[in-house]
Amino acid sequence: MKIITFRFILEFLAAIIMLQTLYFKFTAHPDSVFIFTQLGLEPIGRIGVGIGELIASLLIFIPRTTWFGSLMGLGLMSGAIGAHLFKLGIEVNEDHGSLFLMAVSVFVCCAILLWMTRKDIPFLYKKA
């Protein structure tokens, strides 16, 4: 029971953080537009990342696809962390690093979830 509860907490945290940012991406919030303009990816990148985060969040909650949603989350958050470290800076528009911290939090949750569900990956483990 403790493992299931811990897994649910990780799934919930990763998904809820990614889902709550969708509003800003899909409504073209000025902060979101600023970030993706700085990266040279506005508007295609903003909308594409939003769709990717939506799909990853949904897959994380389906037990058979948690591994794939986690893998997608790792990829998306690697991009976000890399953008913060190499182009944007940790603090963007005086957010005190909250976007960076959320990206790192989702990355850690997804990494642990991927490890916990590694036996569900069909091309790594054959099921009898």
Predicted feature locations:
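Extended, low-polarity transmembrane helix blocks
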Residues: 1-20, 64-128
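N-terminal first-folded block
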Residues: 2-51, 121
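Membrane-interface junctions
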Residues: 42, 61-64
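Hydrophobic, membrane-inserted alpha-helices
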Residues: 51-59
